[in-house]
């Protein structure tokens, strides 16, 4: 794997990345603001609505292959934006007015049948001005689900006489018995452009996925946001544990067809098959893209004036190379700086955007529950032989902006007019599968006392618990045989000292036990690797790595990969 990182040291206020960040935040407001906090039950209030009587929808043959053919045909023609009209009244709704429109959960698709899944619909308005077409698929036949105002409680809204009904829904979410047998919890949301989010059991929503990204994080290049414009919801069987959905992707530069096979549970798995055709060249095509938030963590300098020690949806990128080696890159944001790291990889086994710190004490936020935010693992299946994994970190003013982008750019680039097929799996989970290695748990930086020209880095490695070890894995009871190995890519940097200490021993400050869901009464043994280096005064950044090795030189930990900059 090769790595290239670049930074823009100019203030963000004058940089193109501001537009990118605001665009992402605007799209994600659709999910944060409209879809995630509906009440479980609401009284039905009477209101007078004026809408055209929906006509009967005729069933049509449907298959994913036919949808792929439709997408290819669309890609061969000039882009035509969907012509779904939304009246000004709905467009001009305020946040509170739009939030007051509630979907009646007992009227959801399949809800009255008491089956394994039901579907809620989102009402367009406020920032959710784009609409999508929904179809139900039964027995290979699809039927359009026309907009129905009777499915919503409009609260105190006074809808002007003659206001046309919307011609589509803003999005949808799926429910199942995820946490308890007596309530249908939401576990999946599609809303806004090609954004979607999922959660495993006992977790709140966190980072967002997308179907596709175009030109994300490229300075001076406008980002394009293709839309899932049509969805085909396949009716599940009575005892089904899987929900299957197909979607049509449309955009100025691309058309495509997606099939999602979703299995909710302690680990919610979203299997994705996509056929994509470019209608014109793009600078960067992003597969399996994610948007997340990292405001500040234990290594952030200076920290915002906030009562919480850390605020983030994700705190690290874990990359499993084709060789099986694991590299861990902590997330970080620096005031006024834009960071873009590119990892060139061949046949990667997986990569994950993790929320690894599970201690409530690290966040102190009983409402946002950052210690319980889900992690996501991407497992390539087809079409990921060679490419670049892009990690883009942008400054943010607060926790409402998603400022972290992760995407896979396939190599070679897709050719215009040629259809490419990709298959990958997303695992939305609480904790990653144990590797049997020491794992990076925390990164901190500073300067030694009275030595401001030097840099002190500490990396905490957690020993795998015995229950996590496979047959034949070493238990590492004697840590004296381990040593940290540090590399610095700049030859001008002087490495002064390297050390390793056990900070879980009684005679040193132990890490506190976590207070989050699922935390045990004990912590794994934690070793703290540390090193001091002296960069030249004019050096603005350093690429650093650290890993633990045994006496034979065998690597026994993840490799910590870090980009240090002078403002830290």
Enumerate the language-model features and the residues they cover.
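Acidic, contiguous internal or C-terminal segments within carbohydrate-active enzymes
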Residues: 247-293
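A contiguous, surface-exposed recognition patch within enzymatic or periplasmic domains that forms
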Residues: 96, 189, 283, 287-419, ...
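Solvent-exposed N-terminal domain segments of exported/luminal and surface proteins
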Residues: 75-219
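Terminal accessory/anchoring regions of large secretory-pathway or extracellular enzymes
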Residues: 60-95, 99-104, 122, 362-568
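Extended, loop-rich substrate-binding clefts of extracytoplasmic carbohydrate-active enzymes
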Residues: 209-264, 385-397, 401-402
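N-terminal signal peptide c-region/cleavage motif recognized by signal peptidases
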Residues: 52-54
């Amino acid at each position: 794997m090769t790595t290239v990182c670049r930074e823009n040291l100019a203030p963000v206020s004058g940089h193109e990345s501001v537009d990118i960040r605001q665009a992402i935040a605007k799209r994600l407001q659709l999910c944060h603001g409209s879809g995630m906090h509906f009440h479980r039950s609401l009284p039905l209030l009477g209101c007078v609505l004026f809408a055209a009587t929906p006509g009967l929808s005729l069933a049509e043959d449907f298959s994913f292959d036919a949808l792929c053919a439709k997408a290819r045909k669309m890609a061969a023609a000039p882009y035509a934006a969907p012509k779904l009209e939304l009246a000004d009244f709905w467009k001009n709704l305020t946040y509170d007015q739009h939030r007051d429109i509630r979907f009646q959960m007992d009227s959801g698709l399949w809800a009255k049948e008491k089956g394994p899944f039901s579907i809620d619909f989102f009402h367009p308005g406020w920032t959710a001005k784009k609409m999508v077409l929904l179809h139900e698929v039964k027995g290979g036949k699809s039927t359009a689900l026309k907009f129905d105002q009777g499915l919503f409680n409009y609260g105190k809204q006074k809808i002007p006489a003659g206001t046309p009904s919307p011609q589509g829904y803003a999005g949808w979410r799926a429910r199942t018995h995820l946490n308890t047998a007596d309530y249908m919890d939401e576990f999946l949301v599609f809303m806004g452009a090609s954004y979607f989010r999922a959660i495993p059991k006992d977790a709140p929503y966190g980072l967002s996925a997308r179907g596709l990204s175009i030109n994300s994080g490229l300075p001076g290049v406008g980002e394009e946001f293709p839309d899932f414009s049509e969805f085909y919801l396949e009716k599940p069987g009575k005892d089904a544990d899987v929900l299957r959905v197909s979607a049509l992707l449309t955009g100025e530069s691309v058309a495509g067809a997606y099939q999602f096979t979703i299995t909710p549970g302690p680990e919610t798995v979203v299997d994705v098959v996509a056929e994509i055709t470019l209608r014109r060249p793009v600078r960067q095509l992003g597969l399996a893209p994610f948007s997340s938030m990292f405001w500040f963590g234990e290594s952030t300098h200076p920290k915002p004036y906030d009562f919480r020690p850390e605020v983030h949806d994700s705190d690290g990128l874990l990359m499993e190379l084709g060789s099986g080696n694991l590299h861990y890159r902590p997330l970080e944001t620096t005031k006024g700086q834009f960071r873009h790291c590119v990892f060139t990889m061949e046949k990667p086994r997986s990569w994950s955007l993790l929320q690894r710190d599970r201690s409530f004490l690290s966040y102190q936020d009983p409402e946002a529950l950052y210690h319980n935010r889900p992690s996501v693992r991407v497992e390539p299946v087809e079409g990921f032989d060679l490419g670049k994994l892009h990690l883009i970190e942008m400054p943010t003013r607060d926790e409402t902006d998603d400022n972290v982008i992760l995407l896979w750019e396939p190599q070679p680039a897709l050719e215009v007019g040629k259809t490419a097929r990709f298959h990958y799996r997303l695992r939305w989970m609480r904790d990653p599968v144990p590797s049997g290695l020491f794992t990076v748990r925390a990164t901190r930086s500073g300067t030694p006392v009275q030595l401001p020209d030097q840099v002190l880095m500490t990396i905490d490695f957690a020993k795998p618990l015995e229950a996590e070890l496979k047959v034949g894995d070493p238990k590492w009871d004697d840590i004296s045989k381990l040593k940290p190995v540090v590399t610095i890519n700049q030859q001008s940097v002087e490495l002064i000292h390297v050390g390793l200490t056990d900070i879980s021993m009684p005679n040193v400050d132990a890490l506190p036990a976590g207070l989050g869901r699922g935390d045990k009464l004990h912590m794994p043994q934690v070793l703290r690797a540390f090193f001091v280096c002296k960069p030249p005064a004019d050096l603005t950044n350093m690429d650093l790595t650290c890993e633990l090795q045994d006496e034979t030189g065998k690597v026994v930990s993840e490799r910590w990969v870090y980009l240090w900059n002078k403002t830290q």
